[in-house]
UniProtKB/Swiss-Prot annotation:
Catalytically driven reaction(s): tRNA(Lys) + L-lysine + ATP = L-lysyl-tRNA(Lys) + AMP + diphosphate
Name of the protein: Lysine--tRNA ligase
Cofactor note: Binds 3 Mg(2+) ions per subunit.
Keyword hit for rRNA-binding: no
Complex formation: Homodimer.
Length: 526
């Protein structure tokens, strides 16, 4: 039984592989080992675009600057004695000109039976990666161009490029074949360059605030720090069940105990749950913890961090347009301070329900009549859980401008201190929302080991009553660390993929992940 790979049957692939054989028969290695001492195309443009270089005649006389660079051939047209191409390198392009009497092909023998210009026109294809040396000049229209003296084939492409105008129209193909998407779409390249810059800016800001970047284990013997279903695997060497982390929290708090007063980690987190427009099972987070802070300090840090990023990306401006809300395009201002209100206040303002005026059975009735939640999600819910459900259903998608929603019900987390005012039904937790989605989760961290054990054990009792619940097992090492003594602290977690979505006007989380999780496609079998 053989497996049929679709692209191997394409006419274009077969045609290009025949060219590949012809190139090898000419004594040219189509996949050489290196091409060094190159400038990047953007460097060339930056250095020479405003210079007085002269015209093509000066280039033919070799009187203009000589450059050496490499990139992918993305456009080509033959015009008799001259042929013109466009080379893409990272996110920069430059025009090149091949001349019948001037341009040579590296490795092509004089008696090969084919001239250099014919080799360029007949044996090269769009998508080939080339090394080029030549002389700079400006065309009559002012286009910076390289008169190519020598072209070196660095990689023969065997699959044609996507259409230069349509690109990859099928979103699923774009996500599966991101390499082709990046080649064909300048907007896609810009999105991922912005993502990389956002990561750099996060580190820049956190370093300025005296935080230490650390790395903690991805494989864990016990999972915790969030309410989520883990991925489970087996460590063969120890015959032990292991989990991919669902949060960075517990390990970072252990470092606080160890005397590292400000720590953060940017890393992958894994949750074996649903896939939708804003969720991918593998995603990137930053979590940070600062000794001697509380959630008020963290609020300032979070909004200042995001404002810092937005200003850096937008020439000092704090406003960003987002186009993918059901209500239509919105302009959001990330300038600090952000709107702050308690969860109860937000339900009153945006949901029209003052929860303090309603008994539990009345809150259940509101959930029944004003939401599409199944009855089982709230019929046995505690008062705090009912309040959290009302917020999720009536408020979240209305939080377009940046909001900090504070003072959540105790039932929403076991890792947070109760309100210092003495109301033990609420905790010093806030979540930051923007464009109808959660962006950040943060606490005044609980450091009382006895209270922490009590809350975790209460979660375990709930788990026993509902085996399908997401409450995590107790981490005894974490409790032991708390007994050693953890300073008062504030901490936060931000979903970086979702932040990138907001700042690049992306409709889906898949648009900001190089390789999002996709359903596997089985190869055809004979």
């Amino acid at each position: 039984m053989s497996v049929e790979v679709e692209y191997l049957q394409h006419e274009d692939y077969l045609y290009r592989t025949s060219k590949l054989k012809e190139i090898r028969d000419l004594g040219i290695n189509p996949y050489p080992y290196q091409y060094t001492d190159c400038l990047e195309v953007q460097e060339i443009r930056n250095q020479f675009v405003d210079n007085e270089l002269g015209d093509s005649e000066a280039a033919f006389r070799k009187e203009t600057p000589k450059v050496r660079f490499a990139g992918r051939l993305v456009l080509f047209r033959s015009m008799g004695k001259n042929s013109f191409g466009q080379i893409l390198d990272n996110d920069a392009k430059i025009q090149v000109m091949f001349n019948r009497d001037f341009s040579a092909v590296a490795g092509l023998a004089a008696d090969a039976g084919i001239s250099p210009i014919k080799f360029i026109e007949k044996k090269l294809d769009l998508g080939d990666i080339l090394g080029l040396e030549g002389y700079l000049f400006f065309t009559h229209s002012g286009e910076l161009t390289v008169l190519v003296e020598t072209v070196t084939l660095l990689c023969k492409s065997l699959i044609s490029l996507p259409d230069k105008h349509a690109g990859l129209a099928d979103k699923e193909i774009r996500y599966r074949k991101r390499w082709a998407d990046l080649i064909s779409s300048e907007d896609v390249r810009k999105t991922f360059l912005t993502r990389s810059r956002i990561l750099k800016l996060i580190r820049e800001y956190m370093d300025q605030q005296s935080f230490l970047e650390v790395e903690t284990p991805i494989l864990q013997t016990i999972y915790g720090g969030a309410e989520a279903t883990p991925f489970v695997t087996t460590l063969q060497a120890l015959h032990a069940e292991m989990f991919l982390r669902i949060s960075l929290e517990i390990a970072l708090k252990k470092l606080l105990v160890g005397g590292m007063s400000r720590v953060y980690e940017i890393g992958k987190v894994f949750r074996n749950e649903g896939i939708d427009r804003t969720h991918n099972p593998e995603f990137t987070m930053i979590e940070a913890y600062a000794a001697y802070w509380d959630y008020n300090d963290v609020m300032k840090c979070v909004e200042n961090l995001v404002e810092y990023i937005v200003r850096a990306l937008n020439n000092g401006e704090t406003q960003v347009q987002y186009s993918h809300l059901k209500s239509g395009p919105q302009v959001v201002d990330f300038k600090a301070p952000w709107i702050r209100m308690t969860m109860k206040e937000s339900i009153s303002v945006y949901g029209g329900v003052d929860v303090d005026l309603h008994a539990d059975h009345e809150l259940r009735k509101i959930l029944e009549t004003q939401t599409s939640l199944p009855e089982k999600t709230y019929v046995h819910a505690s008062r705090g859980e009912l309040i959290a459900l009302l917020f999720d259903e009536l408020v979240c998608d209305k939080l377009i401008a940046p909001h900090h929603i504070t003072d959540h019900p105790l039932e929403t987390t076991p890792l947070c201190k109760t309100l210092r005012s003495g109301d033990e039904t609420l905790v010093e937790r806030f979540e930051s929302f923007c464009l109808g989605k959660e962006l950040c989760n943060a606490y005044s961290e609980l450091n009382d080991p006895l209270q922490q054990r009590k809350l975790l054990e209460e979660q375990m009792r709930k788990k026993a009553l509902n085996p399908d619940s997401e409450y995590h097992p107790i981490d005894e090492e974490f409790l032991e660390a708390l007994c050693q003594g953890m300073p008062p602290a504030g901490g936060f977690g931000i979903g970086i993929d979702r932040l990138v979505m907001m700042l690049t006007d992306a409709a889906s989380i898949r648009d900001v992940l190089f390789f999002p999780v996709m359903r596997r496609i089985e190869a055809k079998k004979d």
